[in-house]
């Protein structure tokens, strides 16, 4: 991003650049920690206006400190890069050992709404392979430029227009006789004609609700007895992120919630995120319910259909064949069908049903992912929604 130095003699807020830099560092810190923050159980199913607190490490100024009063100094071999640290004595900090007397690391909290968190996460993502259908009801938020203005934020700086305004000012300020600049600054010499604030132009942006194509997302979740609290929490985290993404990016997308044990039923948003059940598992029941809803309300001719299923893979063995058949039928009518297997822990040999899916589902629009811990939720969802992913291969993402 270009930075223009204002060389005018008009009084200026000198702390503005410091505030801008501080804000960038804070936002960068938030983005780095969002993956684990968004999966916290305390915010699952909450309102988008609910505020959450995010811990951020203090941003310290560079300073000189006293050494250890030992002979010699730290030295490098000439191949160091910015940010490298010289080896030295172990520092005081967390862990075993004697107490230290150095200053601790400053940590403070900032408040941010769930909606702002979601915007950070999914700003550059969209539903994959969305195609034009006969009916158009889906609205997508977009922005278009409507001319220029004198004030604005740095990302909206119109560089070419700003240069044109500077040239116009320069031409207008020349003396008609010898062309000497009236406004040149002695510090730079008369050959230099710097930018001033009056030269800068910014794009005027207007939010526009772009009319797009029909889309429905079917969220299928296993709520059987084998899905303990940890597994259900991970599954709900996945669907919570998916649901918030859809609310952010699309105005009229339909979302259908399906919960299943040995039988399946359509539920509302609150029941889906907060209600638990028990019993056995027939994965095919969830798929058959989804196919039933599609046939009754969402014709593939008119709708872009996306189906996602989360389960621990502990399916009744006699149901595996039927589950594979139903999954293949879903692939035939869906733009994308994603299966997420919830297996907490690091030791995972893969379930029977997942192996059945990978071996017997040949559709290119099928993808399988693993979610082992809460930090896996966001990367797993992004892999499913990544439009740039290879569409020519059936993927088993991990």
UniProtKB/Swiss-Prot annotation:
Residues 11-22, 78-95 have a biased composition (Basic and acidic residues). InterPro entries: Spore_YhbH, UPF0229, vWFA_dom_sf. Residues 1-22, 68-104 are annotated as: Disordered. It comes from the Bacteria. Pfam families: DUF444. PANTHER family: UPF0229 PROTEIN YEAH (PTHR30510:SF2). NCBIfam families: spore_yhbH (TIGR02877). Belongs to the UPF0229 family. This is UPF0229 protein Ccel_0490.
